[in-house]
């Protein structure tokens, strides 16, 4: 397993090599796609990318938590969280890549 993290610049470079756009056009394309995903999530909409997965918004209700060090009860406010659910295709691809190692 690699310690390398895929970055926005890596994505832009890959688009540059695979598609043949200029480096600037590739960076702009990646930025545009990520902005569209972010904007839709911020607007409360889920995002589904076929064969990759879905970004879903879930509302969590408020509850009472406990500080593990002191044992004091602490209220935790209701909040909206972002959840990623990988597609079956992605799960199988990751599983097959791990079994090859």
From Swiss-Prot:
PROSITE patterns: HISTONE_LIKE. Disulfide bonds: none annotated. GO terms for molecular function: DNA binding; structural constituent of chromatin. GO terms for biological process: DNA recombination; positive regulation of metabolic process; regulation of DNA-templated transcription; regulation of translation. NCBIfam families: himA (TIGR00987), PRK00285.1 (NF001401). HAMAP family: IHF_alpha. Belongs to the bacterial histone-like protein family. PANTHER family: DNA-BINDING PROTEIN HU, INTEGRATION HOST FACTOR SUBUNIT ALPHA. This protein is one of the two subunits of integration host factor, a specific DNA-binding protein that functions in genetic recombination as well as in transcriptional and translational control. This is Integration host factor subunit alpha. It comes from Maricaulis maris (strain MCS10) (Caulobacter maris). The lineage of its organism: Bacteria, Pseudomonadati, Pseudomonadota, Alphaproteobacteria, Maricaulales.
């Amino acid at each position: 397993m690699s310690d390398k993290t895929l970055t926005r610049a890596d994505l832009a470079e890959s688009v540059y090599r695979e598609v043949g756009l200029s480096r600037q056009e590739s960076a702009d394309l990646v930025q545009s796609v990520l902005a569209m995903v972010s904007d839709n999530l911020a607007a409360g909409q889920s995002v589904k990318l076929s064969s990759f997965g879905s970004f879903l918004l879930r509302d969590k209700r408020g509850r009472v938590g406990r500080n593990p060090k002191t044992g004091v009860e602490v209220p935790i406010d209701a909040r909206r969280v972002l959840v990623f659910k990988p597609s079956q295709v992605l799960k199988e691809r990751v599983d097959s890549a791990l079994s090859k190692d």
